[in-house]
Regions:
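Flexible mid-to-C-terminal extensions adjoining Fe-S/redox cofactors in radical SAM and related proteins
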Residues: 2-12, 16, 23, 27, ...
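Radical SAM enzyme [4Fe-4S]-AdoMet core and its adjacent flexible, acidic
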Residues: 1-61, 229-345, 353-355, 359, ...
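Radical SAM/AdoMet-radical enzyme domain recognition
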Residues: 148-168, 174-289
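Short, charged low-complexity linear segments at domain edges
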Residues: 96-117, 329-332, 336, 370-386
Length: 477
């Protein structure tokens, strides 16, 4: 398509979606449902045959039913969100990332014959004002920073490939507040999401976030004051509570980032905790299985097979219509069946640390590419990233998706074959040392995972970025 025509079409589509969003925001609860249903039709224009007619109809019925859990959740979020924040997020995350971006990404995967991610994760800084037990982030050291120009390059080049969602981690990203706000203002058509320990969120910062509208937050919290502060330090829980109050008061979208361990798994998933999060204003959250990454890791924090099975059952219950808690939890390790297994290596995301090293995953600290020397596209063609591209899925049981945690022999093989180096500049960890910590875990988890998987409905979603295998092929149990 001619570039000028494409640009005009883009502007017209964005304006049309913007009008629909304005209608949704101007009505309350039940009156919104008709327009929300029309957004399903917009999605169909972009996704086409990627989903079945039944899937589109199910989505339409669910979102237009005022009594469905998901309608109630959407209304709950919209009612407490500042209009500018809600509108900007709907356009940037909804239209640009989900609709238009996904279409562009799929085209580019075919064009460039490599993984093209849906989101890019990067660390503005390695500096952090905390030192949590078992955390790998501190092992990068505290002197590395991506310059504003580095971050601008990441977003600019990512957008050219269709990437309109950027997540910021660290270290503590808000050590770089000023540059983050500057970046969000320059790239006002993308959505930013920040993983933060909450301690640097204050009133002036919240006002700027509302003005810009394109920043959301994931706050680190781990259950009760006792379970949280035992790992994150005394006073951290109180800081999170204060940040939640500020964000809710200003109508800023935020969720939670929860690392579940052997010690806190019930505390971070029980009904009381989930309802408490909703009352504080959080209605979605990411759950992360503790990973034994780094020389200072604490492998004893990894959940038992029984605990992991509990987690799978619990998260699925919390998302079901049977549960009346308006909260949408997502489990990075256990939701593989919905995304076709491992999403790292650029398949759906990758990570750039504060030294510029491009890593397949935030938990895989090995690389042979750097944003200072290479473009995003060159990174995606680098040896380690292509090893991911050619090797995914790493296991046809998507409850055993990771080449480190559940298939440690595969990560060792890829690192050795590609010559990737450790990116932990302060305390480099050999891939043998890392994977040795996962061997017993993987062996112990396999029987339980295989038993669950044998009764799991196979998702027939389109995973066109797998090189050789498609979900329509027979799946080994």
């Amino acid at each position: 398509m001619n570039t000028s025509v494409e640009s005009l079409t883009h502007k017209m589509q964005r304006a049309a979606v913007g009008k629909m969003v304005d209608v949704v925001l101007s009505h309350a609860d039940k009156d919104r449902q008709k327009t929300v249903g029309q957004l399903v039709d917009v999605a169909k224009q972009f996704y086409g045959s990627s989903f079945s007619a039944e899937a589109y109809e199910h989505a339409r019925q669910t979102l237009t039913d005022p009594d469905s859990k998901w309608s109630k959740l959407i209304n709950c979020v919209l009612d407490q969100t500042d209009p500018n924040v809600a509108r900007t997020m709907a356009l940037n995350l909804g239209y640009e990332a989900f609709f238009r971006g996904t279409k562009t990404i799929r085209e580019n995967r075919v064009k460039y014959q490599c993984n093209i991610p849906w989101l890019i994760l990067f660390d503005p800084t390695s500096a952090c004002n905390m030192h949590c037990v078992g955390c790998w982030a501190g092992e990068y050291g505290h002197k590395n920073n991506l310059s504003f120009e580095d971050m601008d390059k990441i977003v600019t080049e990512g957008k050219e490939l269709g990437v309109y969602l950027y997540m910021l981690t660290g270290g503590e990203p808000l050590v770089r507040k000023a540059d983050i706000l500057k970046l969000a203002e320059k790239h006002n058509d993308v959505q930013f999401a920040i993983y933060t320990n909450s301690t640097l969120i204050d009133e002036p910062f919240c006002k700027e976030v509302v003005r810009l509208g394109n920043i959301a937050f994931m706050l680190s919290i781990e259950g009760t004051p006792e379970t949280n502060d035992a790992r994150r330090g005394e006073g951290h829980y109180a800081a999170v509570m204060h940040a939640m109050d500020l964000l809710k008061e200003h109508g800023i979208v935020f969720g939670t980032s929860i690392c579940y361990t052997r010690d806190n798994i019930e505390a971070v998933t029980n009904d009381e905790f989930m309802r408490f999060l909703c009352e504080k204003g959080a209605h979605f959250g990411f759950y992360f299985h503790y990973m034994p990454v780094g020389n200072e890791a604490a492998p004893e924090l990894m959940p038992t097979p029984e605990q992991r099975k509990y987690m799978i059952d619990r998260i699925r219950y919390l998302r079901s219509e049977e549960c009346d808690i308006p909260f949408d939890p997502m489990d990075f390790q256990n939701d593989g069946e919905f995304v076709g297994g491992c999403i790292a290596g650029g398949r759906n995301y990758f990570h750039i640390n504060s030294a510029g090293d491009a890593e397949p995953c935030v938990f895989i600290h090995y690389s042979n590419a750097n944003i200072h020397d290479q473009s995003i596209l060159e990174i995606l063609h680098s040896p380690l990233f292509m090893a991911y591209h050619n090797g995914q899925p790493f296991n046809k049981n998507h409850l055993r998706p990771c080449p480190m945690l559940e298939n440690p022999e595969l990560l060792q093989k890829m690192v050795h074959e590609t010559g990737a180096h450790s990116t932990d500049l302060q305390s480099p960890e050999s891939v043998e040392h890392l994977c040795e910590k996962c061997k017993n875990y993987a062996a112990n988890w396999q029987p339980t995972a295989d038993e669950i998987w044998s009764h799991t409905k196979i998702r027939e979603s389109r995973y066109e970025n797998y090189k050789d295998w498609k979900p329509s092929q027979p799946i080994e149990k």
